[in-house]
Amino acid sequence: MSSRISVSLLLLAVVATMFFTANVVDATPRSQGNMMRYGNSLPAYAPHVLYRFYNSRQFAPINKRNNAEVVNHILKNFGALDRLGDVGK
C-alpha cells in the first residue's frame, strides 16, 4: 500500500512540476519594440502567399512531348555538339 502512495505522490510531483514549468515558459513577455515595429504591418493570414506557392510549376501536371518536339529541342539546345548536328538530315 505504501508503494502505491509513494508512486502516486511521485507522479503527482512530476505532473505539478511539468504544469508549473509550462506556465512559466508561456508567460515570458515579448519585447514591445518588435511588436510595435512589425506587428501592425504583417497580416495574420496571407492567402496570396499560399496561392502563389500552390500555383507554381512543381504542382502543375506534366506535359508530355512527342518525339518531334524532343528532337527539335535537342537540336535547338545542343546543336553545337558534333554528334547531334546531323540527326534531322
Swiss-Prot record:
Keyword Protein biosynthesis listed: no
Role noted for this protein: Probable ligand of isoforms a and b of the calcitonin receptor-like protein, pdfr-1, a G-protein coupled receptor. May not signal through isoform c of pdfr-1. Involved in locomotion; may play a role in circadian rhythms of locomotor activity. Modulator of egg-laying.
Name of this protein: Pigment dispersing factor homolog pdf-2
Keywords: Signal
Keyword Transcription part of the UniProt annotation: no
Gene Ontology BP, a term: parturition
Signal peptide: 1-27
Disruption phenotype: Delay in the timing of the reproductive peak of egg-laying.
SS bonds (residue pairs): none
